Amino acid sequence: MRDYILLYINGREHRVSGEKVFAPVTDYLRYDLGLCGTKVVCAEGDCGACTVMLGRLHGEDLDYKPINSCIQYVFQLDCSHLITVEGLKHNAQLNPVQEAMVECHGAQCGYCTPGFVVAMCSMFDDGKPKTACQIKDGLTGNLCRCTGYEAIVKAGLEVDLSQWEPIAKRYPAGGFVKAFKSHLKESVSITWDGKQLFVPADVKAACEFKARNPETVIVTGGTDVAVNMNKRGLVPDFVMATSNLAGLSDIVTRKDGERTVLEIGGRVTLKALEDFVSDLSEEMKYVMWVFGSPQIRYAGTLAGNIANASPIADTPPMLFTMDAEIEATGVNGVRKIKMTDFYLGYKKLALQSDELITKIHLPLPMSDEIVRLYKVSRRQHLDISAFTAAIRLKVTRGKIETAAITYGGVAAVVMRLPKVEQFLVGKEFSLETCREAGKIARSEVAPISDVRGSRDYRLALAENIFSKFYHETAERELVCQ
Ligand SMILES: Cc1cc2nc3c(=O)[nH]c(=O)nc-3n(C[C@H](O)[C@H](O)[C@H](O)COP(=O)(O)OP(=O)(O)OC[C@H]3O[C@@H](n4cnc5c(N)ncnc54)[C@H](O)[C@@H]3O)c2cc1C
Ligand code: FES
Ligand code: FES
């Protein structure tokens, strides 16, 4: 058992133990190491000022991704290499991204600038030029209050890539890989001031720790837990970081009859899922693309989104409607739980105290099914939904054969709408049917008013989303018949 976190920052080794392990990464960088280029504005993942690149073992290499360091804790970083804005210089000179930002006047007060620079460096590390659209897309997680985005996007368009030195060349992977591989064999246990951290080396050790300490807070991407720690006073006595459970990071496909099913590991990030489904399902790709920002999607996971159990989380409606299943592993082995049985009440899960989510089985839509996923929020990116819906119909010769309907944001938990489903089966697929289904849906839900929307607004959405669904899909249906 190890009693320290092994972490490299800008190529230098750090062995961290005691109090500092329980600190946000930004505190450690700024106050312990004097790396003040990484800024903190919101401390909740919304602005990108704290963006750093995090490299984790991937085969014989390190895979670097941009993340928000304000919502990562040092205990999550065992066996990783962190690159801050200070570590991106080219031989003590500005790198091509920084040069372009200067030339194009991409900074005024400069507070947001390191975050933009790190996010852009990570975008350009593949050595390929980007369109304005791609640059904007890569920067949805970075806010600037004074320069305006035009100059920043222009800088992105003018980066001189002939001068770009890839991260892997600047920081050769060999040394890290050897150190990480030997350290990953051991679990980490650190106790300080009544708090205990456990970083298990395998799932068995994770379940045993959780069985002994049922109140353990699991941290995977940390994009929910760290916000609760930074802003809502969460101070867990027992924390377990899943970062070293390497076997949970894969997505594989299998067949269930004609249907393709994805098996998504419990540590698979939202970005990895977005990339995987991009050729398989336009709807799923879209709903993953509007999820948070790149920094959130590179850290956050599907398992975390499910276990966080928010009624307005973006992925559960798709999982409910596609009849997904959760694979939970505990000390007595593995069992499957239907997604529709997973929430027992507000933030109450059907998991035993020793269990964690190790896999999600997600059936994909068949070519003869119409599936639409809706996220209604005040802006397209980096916003929490007011209302979500997932509608799946199989229509044969104009008649609805099967229906699976799920809404989020209309009750304490995400819910299927059995009355609407029953009504739809056997009906003609028409605007009239969809309008009637909307009315039934309205009567089947009981939303509350909160900052994201009033009760009346949500009731109106519950009803009208069906007409939208019809208008969006009927044309395709007619062509297919
Ligand atoms: C700026 C910002 C934007 C966001 N945007 C969106 C958005 O657009 N849509 C949306 O739905 N959410 C959004 N979120 C919320 C969050 O990013 C997601 O819920 C994310 O999927 C959480 O994943 P994670 O791995 O970071 O979870 P964590 O924070 O690590 O954990 C979340 C919960 O799941 C539990 N948990 C984690 N892993 C497991 C496991 N393997 N087994 C059992 N329990 C586990 C944890 O104990 C915790 O209760 C946003 C958050 C932020 C900060
Ligand atoms: S400080 Fe705003 S995202 Fe980290
Ligand atoms: S330059 Fe001031 S916030 Fe962006």
What are these regions (language model features)?
Residues 54-85:
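S4-like RNA-binding module at protein N-termini
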Residues 12-21:
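Short, contiguous acidic and Ser/Thr-rich linear segments
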Residues 53-54, 66-69, 92, 96-102, ...:
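C-terminal structural segment of proteins
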Residues 35, 40-43, 63, 102-105, ...:
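Residue-level signal for mature regions of secreted extracellular proteins and peptides
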Residues 21-52:
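A basic, amphipathic helix-loop patch mediating RNA/tRNA/ribosome contacts
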Residues 41, 46, 66-69, 81, ...:
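The −1 position to Zn-ligating cysteines in a subset of zinc-ribbon hairpins
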